[in-house]
Regions:
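Intrinsic-disorder/low-complexity accessory segments
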Residues: 1-59, 63-90, 136, 142-143, ...
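Carboxylate/His-rich catalytic cores and anion/metal-binding grooves
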Residues: 69, 86-109, 114
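Short, active-site-adjacent cap segments at secondary-structure transitions
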Residues: 99, 175-176
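Active-site cavity-forming subdomains of large catalytic enzyme subunits
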Residues: 106-123, 145, 164, 202-203
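Aromatic- and acidic-residue-enriched carbohydrate-binding clefts of CAZyme catalytic domains
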Residues: 118-138
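Detector for the c-type heme attachment site
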Residues: 172
Length: 512
């Protein structure tokens, strides 16, 4: 909808004056970990990314974020100064602005003067699509990995711009629950997450508990939710040397609601979220050095981790489903994965790939754990119960042809590809004299067909294989090829042959 995604950066005025230099120093923790001594780390503030309400109708997180911003901006005293000096807090109050708007507009448009807890009241019954998803009806808390949505694209870009040591993901759950904070169920953790990161989660938990104890709110931990899928906010940080934490507050879904513990108010939900988030900040200040050292060690051990992996690289075939293969590579690059052209031919499983036929991804690079987490095929787990997502191998999701490389790929690495471009199509034979033929074998064929129809052209669909002379050469075409006539039979048609020529030249460039 063209609206900006907003976030606030909260830190001490002295840090604000030197903010970009502090960001660059923070990036060195992952880029040059062996140069970041403990003495250097002790001089750096911890960077934390605090995100709220990725599901728009789990609204209390946003209100808690506003309270936190006010507390940190307006507060004075030693405690506030200690927080601001030792942390750089990236606060995103609305992970999902469109979903939140749907929810807020429904509640405000259907509530009465007197609050009601009756679950049959209109205020409590949003119609489809509700507020959980974004404008395109996508669950943004499953999109940190595939990055298909504009909100996710901006969020992942911001994450890697700063590379925080901590990522908070604030949610709501059923009204009959209390308050959940991680750690989750011990046996349901992705094996690529280091034990040291899990240990830090356990060290943080008492800080959440203390703040909730202060206001006598009930809570629990370790009894639900998993950490398998790296496409959720609470787990995405785990595979980047950060610690991801999930908060879940019992939801009133409106100003107040009935629960098996009596009346639950929105104000109560906001208070719990605010206090637990303060607990997170308390813990980050107290454990700052441990978090910074953990991220440094996470990346310092990358080569060691890669050496233990039997897979030394992944090869992605560009000759099959080329557009989808390029889109996969583009997605991997969003997560700081290094990809390379082939320097020379390589043969894998009897298939020969020449330079230009494939892209190769070595596992010996800083993001080696992430590569394993999204490229390997895992079919057995210590605990086979999943919260929801149970498969996340990205090449399979994109439907591309890829291979494990078991030999060291150094000799085959060509130039590094910093930003892959999706290829354009080809217009073979120049201007058509009768019709254009569009084989149905490219990812964006449906987009092109829509634009052809929208221009007023009535194309035809072939129902059997055939041959045709193109540019003096006989070519074979499969069933499903689209025939785009130059002259329209429709007497009311206004599109001319020159307009058809111009559209075809445009489509091969823009729709690949």
């Amino acid at each position: 909808k063209g609206r900006r995604l907003i976030h606030a950066i909260v830190t001490h005025p002295d840090n604000h004056k030197n903010l970009d230099n502090l960001r660059l120093e923070n990036i060195k923790i992952s880029d040059m970990p062996n140069q970041m001594t403990n003495a250097k780390l002790e001089k750096l503030p911890l960077v934390a990314y605090l995100g709220f309400s990725v599901h728009g109708d789990e609204a209390s997180g946003t209100e808690a974020a506003i309270l936190l911003l006010h507390h940190l901006a307006a507060g004075t005293g030693d405690e506030i100064n200690e927080i601001l000096k030792n942390t750089i807090l990236i606060i995103d109050p609305m992970f999902n602005p469109d979903g939140r708007d749907r929810f807020v507009n429904w509640v405000n448009g259907n509530r009465g003067v007197v609050p009601t807890t009756d679950l049959q009241d209109r205020e409590h019954n949003q119609p489809w699509p509700r507020g959980r998803t974004n404008h395109y009806l996508f669950d943004l808390n499953r999109d940190w990995l595939p990055v298909t949505q504009p909100e996710s694209e901006g969020r992942v870009k911001l994450f890697h711009h700063w590379r925080p040591q901590f990522l908070l993901d604030v949610h709501e759950m059923g009204a009959n629950s209390t308050y959940f904070f991680q750690p989750g169920i011990k046996s349901r953790i992705n094996p690529n997450t280091p034990q040291e990161g899990i240990d830090l989660t356990y060290k943080l938990a008492p800080f959440f508990a203390k703040r909730l104890d202060d206001i006598k709110s009930l809570y629990y931990s370790e009894e639900s939710f998993d950490d398998f899928y790296y496409g959720k906010g609470s787990t995405y940080g785990d595979i980047h040397g950060s610690v991801g934490i999930l908060f879940e507050q019992a939801s009133s879904r409106a100003r107040e609601t009935d629960s098996n513990q009596g009346k639950l108010t929105y104000a109560f939900s906001v208070r719990n979220q605010y206090m637990a988030t303060l607990g997170a900040v308390d813990g980050l200040v107290a454990l700052r050095n441990e978090f910074l050292r953990y991220q440094r060690n996470f990346y310092a051990k990358s080569s060691e981790v890669a050496s233990k992996n039997k897979v030394k690289g992944y090869l992605i075939n560009l000759n099959k489903n080329r557009t989808r293969a390029q889109m996969l590579v583009k997605t991997l690059q969003r997560h700081r994965i290094e990809v390379y052209d082939l320097k020379k031919s390589i043969t894998i499983k009897g298939k020969r790939f020449a330079k230009g036929d494939a892209i190769i991804i070595p596992t010996n690079q800083p993001q080696t754990r992430f590569i394993a987490g999204v490229m390997e095929k895992v079919t057995t787990f210590e605990d086979s119960l999943f919260y929801d997502v149970s498969a996340w191998t990205l090449p399979l999701a994109f439907g591309v042809d890829y291979y494990e490389v078991k030999q060291r790929p150094d000799a085959f690495l060509g130039a590094r590809i910093n930003d892959i471009n999706i290829d354009g199509g080809k217009l073979i034979g120049g201007k058509a004299s009768s019709a254009y033929l569009m084989p149905w074998d490219r990812y964006y064929n449906p987009k092109s067909l829509y634009r052809i129809l929208n221009a007023g052209i009535i194309p035809r669909l072939t129902t059997a294989p055939f041959t045709a002379m193109v540019n003096g050469q006989e070519l074979n075409f499969k069933r499903g090829t689209i025939v785009i006539p130059l002259v329209q039979r429709d007497a009311d048609a206004t599109i001319t042959p020159n307009m058809v020529h111009a559209l075809m030249e445009k489509l091969v460039v823009e729709d690949h």
